[in-house]
């Protein structure tokens, strides 16, 4: 494999869909949100993306079979006659600068093929969120930005970089004449963060005007918060032990003259 390829297993019958992208990143916010959407909407997989820019290993199943790392496209036909969706997530982001650009370009070409006019990218925004994580937004156009702000998002601070596919798609979308908006959930970043993903989905469902049952994330949020509390206690214990060791060492200091 010399370059990124997209293989379709079936044709998706969609009417000017919105494409939602959520690859692994800070706090896995994008992947958690997109996977939850796929499950809630019962979206159907219709294409896969393979790339030599993904990490060089295969995944092994419980039965011992293997598969390459990949990205997956899912389609959802809105029975209410409103916005159809293409949802894209995957096992990894590209591990090279060239790969990030190449995969973003392939995604945009694929979006163009299905007459996508708007793309929503989802990711994490590193921040110590105390209570409810905020959603930070950046967009290629004022209308999309205003829609997100009305839905509860806050405009990204000037100069803040959006790293990876979530950001590059925004930057490259204008060359394909596609509008794009990025929703970033505040997250500590070092653990999977379903709470940040839920905040993003609350904004997204308002923008898309679809009803989602987000209570399924509450159990995952509780598990994540228990893990954070456990790690904080471990860190506090480590610091306390370090202080005690330092005190003991100070007592043992002798001066030789």
How should each PLM-predicted stretch be described?
Residues 94-145:
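Internal, conserved structured core segments that host functional sites
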Residues 23-29, 94, 124-128, 163, ...:
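Gly/Ser/Thr-rich loops at beta-strand to alpha-helix junctions
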Residues 1-91:
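N-terminal short beta-loop-beta anion/metal-coordinating cradle
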Residues 47, 86-88, 118-120, 179-184:
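Hydrophobic/aromatic beta-strand patches that form the interior of the parallel beta-sheet core
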Residues 179-257:
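Extended, histidine- and acidic-residue-enriched regions that form the cofactor-binding/catalytic faces
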Residues 28-32, 98-102, 164, 168, ...:
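Conserved active-site and cofactor/substrate-binding residues in soluble primary-metabolism enzymes
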Residues 106-119, 175-179, 207-212:
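Secondary-structure boundary elements
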Residues 128-207:
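Catalytic cores of processing enzymes, dominated by hydrolases/peptidases
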